[in-house]
């Protein structure tokens, strides 16, 4: 074997690995974590912890396919602005490591696959909800709202709320009020979570021409909005306590108090003209949501008596 042949044979695995990692990056695995954090507790609450583990697994697979497909299509649509932002400049399409056509096909295959997987392993409603989520995220949020309004994440964030609806419908075949409350929790949680991160990268959004609220409003205006939505989030988690036991209710109160304290600290710091660390609220908002939904899962598995007596 010549030196050139040996070099090519050794380089092939490296190229394959690079390609696989590039396609994986298109799916935004960290974003998919929200699916795992919220969908499983929703399914457990739907049947008070007695859900078939295989149904949970199949729903998660279908949900991950849907999220991966939506995220990939989002990368295709946002390739031009990703190149202008430091935070996203290393994404595969921004670096041209994956052809746009291939990424589009990849995203469509994942999206179609999610529908048929959920339809075949759960029910038609969960499959249709997955398709609706993908369509909303790509067409309404990415193509319509993101570049046109500072309230983009408020309405566009509805797509991130759908895993609880998909999970609930996979178990029950219907949509009931606890699923709508969980939807509302994530809906209200999304703006403070996203805007806290956007405060850190507001110059990126300005450079890309994306009117994210921190890029077009004062810090005081942004933190006031963050505070309002944080209060709405916490109050909505308390409403869900009607369908749960004392464990979830206790954690919702304690975690909610902690989340509110952090939001007030950010707002008051900006109000006093002090240096603030919005990224801290962003990171802790992840922990808050994880703790609340983990408590919901444990409460459901233990089948603790609910405040409504059912």
Curated annotation (Swiss-Prot):
Membrane-topology descriptor: Multi-pass membrane protein
Superkingdom assignment: Bacteria
Transmembrane segments: 31-51, 53-73, 102-122, 124-144, 149-169, 170-190, 242-262, 289-309
Compartments where located: Cell membrane
Catalytic activity: heme b + (2E,6E)-farnesyl diphosphate + H2O = Fe(II)-heme o + diphosphate
UniProt entry keywords in alphabetical sequence: Cell membrane, Heme biosynthesis, Membrane, Transferase, Transmembrane, Transmembrane helix
Pathway, per record: Porphyrin-containing compound metabolism; heme O biosynthesis; heme O from protoheme: step 1/1
Predominant localisation class: membrane
Family: Belongs to the UbiA prenyltransferase family. Protoheme IX farnesyltransferase subfamily.
Other facts: Carbon 2 of the heme B porphyrin ring is defined according to the Fischer nomenclature.
Name of the protein: Protoheme IX farnesyltransferase
């Amino acid at each position: 074997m010549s030196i050139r042949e040996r070099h090519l044979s050794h380089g092939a695995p490296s190229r394959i690995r690079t390609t696989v990692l590039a396609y994986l990056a298109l799916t935004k695995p960290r974003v998919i974590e929200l699916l795992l954090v919220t969908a499983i507790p929703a399914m457990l609450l739907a049947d008070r912890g007695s859900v078939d583990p295989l149904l949970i697994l199949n729903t998660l697979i279908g949900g991950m396919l849907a999220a991966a497909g939506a995220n990939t299509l989002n990368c295709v649509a946002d390739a031009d602005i990703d190149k202008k932002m430091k935070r996203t400049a290393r994404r595969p399409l921004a670096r041209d490591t994956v052809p746009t056509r291939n990424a589009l096909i990849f995203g469509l295959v994942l999206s179609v696959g999610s529908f048929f997987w959920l339809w075949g392993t759960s029910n038609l409603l969960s499959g249709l909800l997955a398709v609706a989520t993908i369509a909303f995220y790509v067409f309404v949020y990415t193509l319509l709202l993101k570049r046109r309004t500072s309230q983009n994440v408020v309405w566009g964030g509805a797509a991130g709320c759908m895993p609880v609806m998909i999970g609930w419908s996979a178990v029950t075949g219907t949509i009931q009020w606890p699923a709508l409350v969980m939807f509302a929790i994530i809906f209200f949680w999304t703006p403070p979570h996203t805007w806290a991160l956007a405060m850190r990268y507001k110059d990126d959004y300005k450079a890309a021409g994306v009117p994210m609220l921190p890029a077009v409003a004062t810090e005081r205006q942004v933190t006031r909005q963050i505070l309002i939505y944080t209060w709405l989030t916490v109050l909505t988690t308390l409403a869900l306590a009607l369908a749960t036991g004392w464990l979830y209710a206790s954690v919702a109160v304690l975690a909610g108090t902690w989340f509110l304290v952090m939001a007030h600290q950010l707002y008051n710091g900006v109000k006093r003209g002090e240096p603030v660390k919005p990224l801290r609220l962003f990171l802790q908002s992840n922990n808050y949501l994880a703790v609340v939904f983990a408590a919901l899962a444990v409460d459901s598995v233990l089948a603790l008596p609910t405040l409504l007596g059912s």
